[in-house]
Every structure is written in structure tokens, then in C-alpha cells.
Amino acid sequence: MAACRGFLLRRINDSCLTFRRHKFKKKWATTLPKIPCSRLALQYFDMNYSMQFGDLWPSIRISLLTEQKYGALVNNFSHKETVLKNLSAFNAKDFISEAQHVISLLQIQNNLDTSEKMTSGEASLNLVGQKNNAEKTQATNLLSSLSNTKLTCFKFSRGDISRFPQSRSDSFGLLEYYLMDAASLLPVLALDVQHGHSVLDLCAAPGGKTLALLQTENCQYLAANDLSTSRSSRLHRVLRSYVPRAQRTEHKVCITSQDGRLWGDAEANTYDRVLVDVPCTTDRHSLLEEENNIFHRIRTKQRQMLPLLQAELLVAGLRAVRPGGEVVYSTCSLSQLQNECVVERAVELAASDHGVHVKPQDLSCFREVFKNTFNFFQGCRVGELVLPHLTANFGPMFFCKLLRIE
């Protein structure tokens, strides 16, 4: 009998489930499959940009996922004539000189139309469209500046996917040209820096636009700032590689690493021109690169706070420019929230909180003179937006010009 009871107890013990308490609870983040940041970015863009751009989104989408097209910004401090000859040998063309040719043709046609309409007694249609006198003057001055700019940037024709070789050093040790998204020059051209101007580049690194500002040879003084010390170091390297020491003395170029939002208090009403090329979602980078991707889960809050940061930086830029001066705001994002909405919000904040009144400027003339190089979106409330396209895979690049009213 005792043996039978022992046998039954062993069978019961063997069949019972025993519960074991683990030291740590498993986290969902370690058990669920990890989604790449680039995939998260694509999902986000599909959800938002498909509504923003409608039927245009599939074309933009495939262009963003395809290799970007580059332009070659010629270094005016190098042996320029030799560089122009070498780049022309690649069957590349300077898109700025092409735009200057378009401006000349439009001006000739406009003069002919004006003469004919004055003879027939009809109203004249100006090259810059149906605008009031102040807007006509501003647009005419901008076109005149485009006609006389010293910037030169080569690009391959539409549909040509050739790539420029890496730049070589000249006899002075300076690199001959700088490879960059050609659309990144549009904010610099829109800024319209004139001879003797003091200029602030509020978010300067990695340095392409800063270098372009110096290539205009119009900056009497250039302040280049970026919050990141590592990115500021890269900016230093870029300028050392392209600009002679005599052109980047502390009296001509000052590189700082400060919070750009404080610039409005530190140097209010100081500069003739201010470029505010803000941190953004960098749409193309977010789709193609995992490293330093703003769609990483640990950067979710940072991404959500971007429009606020952008508006604060733009307000600082508007305060730093003197009355009568101009500010250009730019991003490399397609997002309305980071583009038009930020501009509109910053204009309101500058007026209500600081008594700084500004007026957005019409840049529609850029669509006309650069239409052979870039694809522009027609639906912006303010500013202009370059859309990526497979035949001309530049951008995205949004830029908006603001005039501080005296």
C-alpha cells in the first residue's frame, strides 16, 4: 500500500506545472523585430506626402529613393579658367549662365511686348508679372543680381546620370570645385548678397552654402554659426580646402558654435543678410542612410519638436537682420509643417513678441529662369520648393525670402 501511494505521488509531481519567476521582464522592444530607420521614414512620408502632393507623390517617391544628382560649384579662388575648361570637357554646363541667358531673352521679349502695347495703347505686361510697383522693383533687382552673380555651378543635362569625379587640388593647394546638390545654391542666389554686405549664416555646417556665399565675393563680413562642434569642425575643413587664408581672416570670416536661437538677443539689428538653413528631416538622407537618421526611435521627440526649433531659429534670424535687410529660410524637406507653416508662424511670433515686422517676397521669377534645370512645385503658399524628379534629381529644397520692414 505504501509503495502504491509513493508511485501515485511521483506521477502527480511529474505532471504538475511549476512556475518560475524570472529576474527581469522581457521588453517588447527586444522581442519584436527591429524596423530600419529608413523604412520608418518611408512609411511616414507615404502617409503624409501622399496627401500633400497627391498624384505627384509616386514620381517624387521613386526619385528620392534613387541616387541624387550633383552639381559642381566652381572655386573662384582656384584657377577658374582651367576648371571651367575641364568641367566643360565632361559635357556639363553651367546652369547659372543658362539662367542668365533666359533672363536676357525674357527682357528682350518684354521690351518688345512693351513697345508694341504702348504703340497700340494696350497695358504693358511686365516680365515679373502683375505686381505692384514695390514688388516689381524687388523682382527686377533680383533678376539683375542673378545676371551679374559670380557663382558658377556645372551640372549634367536632364536625364544624364553621369557623375563628376572628385575635385583635385590646384598649385595653391585649393580644391577646384565643390560637389553639392545644385538646388542648394538657390537660397544663396535668393539672398541677393550685394558688395559690402555683412552676412550671417545661422546654421552653417557642413559648409556648402557658406562656401557659396564666399564665392560671391560680396561679403564684407561673414558670420558662420552651427550648434554642433563636430559639424563646425567640418565647416573649418571645407573653408581651409577652398578659400585662401587671406580671405578667411577673423576680420572677414568668423566661425562660431552657439545656439542659433540666442542670436536675436546677442546681435539684434546687425546684419544686411541672414541665411537660416535650419535642421530638418533631411528627407533624402532619411530614406537612404541609417546612420544619424532622425527617424531612429530614440530621436522621436527631437523630430516632433523640429517645427518649434525651426520657428525659433527663424525668429532669431529676423531679429538679427537690420531693418531693410533680408532673410532667406531654407530646408531640404518636402514637409509643409517644416516649410510654409514655420514661415507663417515665425512671422507672427516676430511681430507679436518682438515688434519685428517682415514681408514674404515673391520668388516666382526663379521658377521661370531655372525651369530648365529644376522641377518646381506650383502649390506653395509662400516660398518655392524644388521637387526631385528622375530626369533632374535635385532637391528637395524649400526656400523663402523675407524682407524686414523699416
Curated annotation (Swiss-Prot):
Binding site for S-adenosyl-L-methionine: 207-209, 226, 231, 259-260, 277
One biological process term in Gene Ontology: RNA methylation
Predominant subcellular localization, coarse grouping: mitochondrion
Listed GO MF terms: mRNA (cytidine-5-)-methyltransferase activity; RNA binding
Swiss-Prot/TrEMBL keywords: Methyltransferase, Mitochondrion, RNA-binding, rRNA processing, S-adenosyl-L-methionine, Transferase, Transit peptide
Presence of keyword Transferase: yes
Function summary: Involved in mitochondrial ribosome large subunit biogenesis. Mitochondrial RNA cytosine C(5)-methyltransferase that methylates cytosine to 5-methylcytosine (m5C) in various RNAs, such as rRNAs, mRNAs and some long non-coding RNAs (lncRNAs). Involved in mitochondrial ribosome small subunit (SSU) maturation by catalyzing methylation of mitochondrial 12S rRNA.
Places the protein is found: Mitochondrion
Protein name: 5-cytosine rRNA methyltransferase NSUN4
Similarity field: Belongs to the class I-like SAM-binding methyltransferase superfamily. RsmB/NOP family.
Enzyme Commission designation: 2.1.1.-
Catalytic residues identified in the record: 332
SUPFAM superfamilies noted in UniProt: S-adenosyl-L-methionine-dependent methyltransferases
Class of enzymatic activity (EC top level): transferase
Domain of life: Eukaryota
GO cellular component: mitochondrial matrix
InterPro entries in the cross-refs: MeTrfase_RsmB-F_NOP2_cat, MeTrfase_RsmB-F_NOP2_dom, RCMT, SAM-dependent_MTases_sf
Catalytic activity: a cytidine in rRNA + S-adenosyl-L-methionine = a 5-methylcytidine in rRNA + S-adenosyl-L-homocysteine + H(+); a cytidine in mRNA + S-adenosyl-L-methionine = a 5-methylcytidine in mRNA + S-adenosyl-L-homocysteine + H(+)
Cysteines joined through disulfide linkages: none
